[in-house]
Amino acid sequence: MAENLAALRFTRRYGASLEEVWQVLTDPASISRWLGPPADVDARMRTVEPGRVLELDWTRRGEGGSLVRLELAPDGAGTVLVLDHSRLEARVCMGYFGFWTPRLDRFGAELREGRR
């Protein structure tokens, strides 16, 4: 039922080049540090536009399928990352706010660590 679906958007600016951000976003070792173990999520690539867009079909046990889209844009000497998590069941939407917020914080820490 479309009326019961929700979406979240997170926008973060990082003081790193688009290439550095893309590397941390797509490198398996980096992913395991900022996103954590796969747990009960099945994430399958839907769209990849290197250096710009990564879109995933996201399915978590006990939930309907949803869509995660990460989009990058250069911003001066840094990069803006926009993460949209859409087609979420309303009952799980706020749980994903708590899921993505610390992971995006760890993503920023992973970028800073790589720049040292």
Q: Language-model features: where?
A:
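Hydrophobic-ligand binding "helix-grip"
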Residues: 32-89, 93, 98
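Tryptophan-centric aromatic hotspots in well-structured domains and transmembrane helices
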Residues: 22-25, 58, 99-100
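Hydrophobic ligand-binding cavity/cleft-lining segments
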Residues: 1-37
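Positively charged, low-complexity terminal tracts
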Residues: 1-3, 54, 115
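A very general structural signal that marks isolated residues within well-ordered alpha-helical segments
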Residues: 26-27, 51, 106, 113
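A conserved amphipathic terminal alpha-helix motif
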Residues: 87-116
